[in-house]
Curated annotation (Swiss-Prot):
The keyword Methyltransferase applies. The active site is at residue 287. This is O-methyltransferase ucdC. Disruption phenotype: Impairs the production of usterphenyllins and uscandidusins and leads to the presence of trace amounts of atromentin. It comes from Aspergillus ustus.
């Protein structure tokens, strides 16, 4: 049996990313099929311990400390380095090892592994902090919220499990305005999470038009402080034309000073002020809103589009069946926090066609299973 498992490991190292993901899913199915009823129940009910344990490890700096050395460390050494009580720390270390967050090489001997390095990274710490402080409280309230609302699909962003979790009357955006600490956590997480899911070869080809340097090439609508505009300038250096970054006034106060990018305050629910741009770009914006509000946003853009304008929607495009667990979890997060959702291709088509647009193409980035560019033009 060990030989078969080793053979799978070798196969995984030479597989494409799509093959690797299929292998992971198949092995997950196999693992579940081997569980007893008690195994299954224990796995499900104890899942919250992983994020709680990871948060403790991040707070203590355990993962960072272990990754700074190639050698194993004992609990006493780690206690001195972290300031934790040795008796407590050894119990935590045993849990981390059992959850495969760290490696246990012997009695009282612990070291970093692949998971440790992931949790010690800036992206890993950001994931843990944001999910522990912001996502989990909202998801924890979701069962009670759905029961209380008689299992109706939530679409009112002011009446969600998010409001129940944080005793808040406004939406998530006003919550951030009142809580700068969580706003910083969220912005940092968004920057790190989305930094590696754009296929820059695809983007460069799309944006390579014979545009006048004085004409507007792209309007990044709801683009935050400008991280994606910065990446566009860095990864597509030969494109011609102006880049305009738009977001709310309070966001634009912190816009990055990016050469070749103009910052402009704009609310997505107001008519688009830039007329006749070559590309209007919405990245991760529409999944924050239910369909009715998305239609309002899209109609505001359609009114500004010229005959040569193209709308580019950069989002997840889900299949109609066999959606992976990561995407379904994201969909439930959007429901609980925004009253919105992730959408299938057929849903996207219905949405854009209802606002005077027609689908021209879908270009998948190929770096994430479902992330892609929805290319739409104005119906004439």
């Amino acid at each position: 049996m060990e030989q078969e498992l080793n053979r799978l490991g070798v196969l995984a190292h030479s597989a494409t990313d799509a093959q690797r993901k299929r292998l992971v899913e198949n092995l997950r199915d196999l693992m579940i099929s081997l569980e007893t009823i008690d195994d299954t129940l224990e796995r499900i009910v104890h899942t919250p311990f992983e994020i709680d344990g990871a948060k403790i490890g991040v707070n203590l700096g355990i993962f960072r400390t272990l990754t700074q050395s190639d050698a194993s460390m004992d609990a006493e050494t780690l206690a001195k380095m972290t300031g934790a009580d040795p008796d407590l720390l050894v119990r935590l270390l045993r849990y981390f090892a059992s959850a495969r967050m760290i490696a246990e090489h012997g009695s009282d001997s612990f070291a970093a592994n692949k998971v440790t390095r992931a949790l010690a990274s800036a992206k890993g710490e950001s994931y843990v902090d944001v999910f522990y402080e912001m996502v989990l409280p909202t998801i924890h309230e979701l069962p009670n919220f759905l029961e209380r609302t008689h299992y109706r699909n939530p679409t009112d962003r002011y009446h969600l499990s998010f409001q129940d979790a944080f005793n808040w009357e406004g939406d998530l955006f006003t919550f951030f305005e009142a809580d700068p600490h969580r706003q910083v956590l969220f912005n940092r997480h968004m920057q790190l999470q989305r930094s590696s899911i754009t296929n820059w070869g695809t983007m460069a080809t799309l944006l390579a038009t014979n545009q006048s340097p004085d004409a507007v090439l792209l309007v990044d609508i709801g683009g935050g402080v400008g991280h994606q505009c910065e990446r566009i300038r860095a990864n597509c250096p030969n494109i011609q034309g102006r880049l305009i970054l738009q977001d709310l006034p309070e966001v634009m106060k912190n816009a990055l000073p990016i050469p070749g990018v103009e910052a402009m305050a704009h609310n997505v629910f107001e008519p688009q002020p830039i007329k006749g741009a070559k590309f209007y770009y919405l990245r991760g914006v529409l999944h924050d809103f239910p369909d009715d509000q998305c239609k309002e946003i899209l109609r505001g853009i359609v009114g500004a589009m010229g005959v040569d304008s193209t709308l580019v929607i950069d989002e997840m495009i889900l299949p109609d069946r066999n959606i992976n667990w990561q995407a379904t979890v994201m969909d439930l997060q959007m429901m609980a926090n925004f009253g919105s959702q992730e959408r299938t291709r057929s849903h996207w088509v219905r949405l854009i066609e209802s606002t005077g647009l027609m689908l021209r193409d879908v270009l998948y980035h190929g770096l994430d299973e479902y992330q892609g560019l929805i290319i739409a033009v104005k119906t004439m």
